[in-house]
């Protein structure tokens, strides 16, 4: 199993404030999004996170979940992100689970929730990956 905590964030993840938090034994991988002002898509009086920021979270968290389930190099080949409500510019919990990791393809589901007492679900997504090595 890959030690996900030892992997450095990509430059894009670092720019978005996306960091690895933990991997659970049940296959859930958790990341934290601390969005900078550059990740916003709206202005005052009601700023919100840009949809591209949330889609990047689906891609990255899905990759972490797939890599944990079956290490060996994966590349996203398909991505879907459903935006359920405006995402406030606050920290968010990004949780992913690998649904399937085969010899050549893998699929992960992702939930993005506000990281606060309400834990409102703001987006869900699914990412598919193709193995790039071996």
Predicted segments, located by residue:
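N-proximal, solvent-exposed amphipathic alpha-helical segments enriched in charged/polar residues
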Residues: 1-11
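Hydrophobic beta-strand-centered segment that forms part of the acyl-chain substrate-binding groove
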Residues: 63-93, 98
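Hydrophobic residues in beta-strands and at strand termini
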Residues: 33-35, 83, 131
């Amino acid at each position: 199993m890959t030690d996900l905590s030892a992997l450095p964030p990509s430059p894009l993840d670092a720019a978005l404030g996306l960091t690895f938090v933990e991997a659970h034994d049940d296959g859930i991988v958790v990341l934290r999004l601390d969005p900078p002002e550059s990740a916003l898509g709206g202005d005052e009086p009601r700023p919100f996170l840009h949809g591209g920021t949330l889609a990047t979270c689906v891609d990255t968290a899905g990759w972490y979940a797939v890599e944990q389930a079956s290490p060996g190099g994966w590349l996203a080949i398909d991505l879907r992100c459903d935006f359920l409500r405006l995402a406030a510019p606050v920290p968010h919990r990004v949780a992913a689970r690998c649904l399937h990791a085969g010899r050549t393809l893998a699929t992960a589901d992702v939930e993005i929730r506000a990281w606060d007492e309400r834990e409102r679900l703001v987006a869900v997504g699914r990412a598919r990956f193709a193995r790039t090595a071996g």
